[in-house]
Amino acid sequence: MKLIPTGEMTLGPFFPREFAAGANHLGDEIEVMGKITQLDGRALDNVVVEIWQADRDGRFDNPKFSGWGRAATDAKGIYRFKTIKPGAPKGRIAHINFLILYSGLMRQLQTTMFFELAADPVLDAVPEKRRALLVARREGTVYRFDLRLRGERETPFFDD
């Protein structure tokens, strides 16, 4: 499947218009979930959460794997995705990228969820004492990745 070029002023990543049937069932299935909170710990509802990731072989350009999803948090601030565990792209460790959009934010927030603490150029750029905030907690086949938008334990966010 070929990706269509888009204008420079749009947000990426860019995805194909259609995905093959069963496109997300090409690896070990996992659930990624978490809670999004604000400075005082209150849950935020109706936050738009987008993810994008590599396939099980670490490729982002697999036409048989969509590699992305979008969800909104519920009244308790919870989001959920069913996906596969990604492989490690060249020069990186396995990860899932997140984009957060919320009414009142002046810009989108981007972060990355890792499955372990290990050498990675993005993770290594985060101060060591804050790196654990980017590692999901595993609970069976569920990976919990809570996001705090502000405060002492604020999730590290990256410039786009």
Placement of each model-derived feature along the sequence:
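Beta-strand-dominated extracellular/periplasmic modules and repeats
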Residues: M1-D160
